[in-house]
Amino acid sequence: LYQDSTLLALNTVGGRESLVATTTARFHAWSQRRLRAWPHTMNCTATHDTKRGEDVRARLAVLSEMPDAWTTAVERWFSSLAGSNIPTPWLKEVDRATHLFLLQTIVGAWPEQADMDSYADRVAEYAVKVVREAKIRSSWLEPDERFERSLAAFVRFSLKGEGARHFQKCFAPVISSLRHHGLVNSLGQVLLKVTCPGVPDFYQGT
């Protein structure tokens, strides 16, 4: 859940790559089986174990429909870093997989009315949790504090430091698309939850 940075919309309990897409016919067949076998089961889109909010997952799912635009934005960002004044140790410390994980996190949860200082601090704290949960570069039992400090500093550089202008220039089109199409996904998600066989479950008002 914290090691694979391919598509974070799938990185949740019960998620798997085979669920990326399906056909209309297969979806209806699945719904009919569900109605026969478990007519009173819960239709959950969020639980206490969910790693991301429903709306963030709905936004990130859009990346699967715009891989070229996403790849272009990411490569532009990496190119801008190569020509920036970012301290070299930060670039050496932050591996590409962690970097991609955080980029998706940032654009998926991008706030409507951005208080970037607060947002940068929240993402920096979350970044430390991510690498500890991944247990590759750090962990809860044996934290690599130097790496974590570099990671948090890099996040703040990207969102409210010298890199912020470059970041928004690279990712503004992607964020705009995720916001618009993610809203459609969110509404569709709620519609399916309340109309498909089963009992809709709304976790903490979601």
Short names for language-model regions:
Residues 1-206:
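Catalytic cores of glycan-processing enzymes that make or break glycosidic bonds
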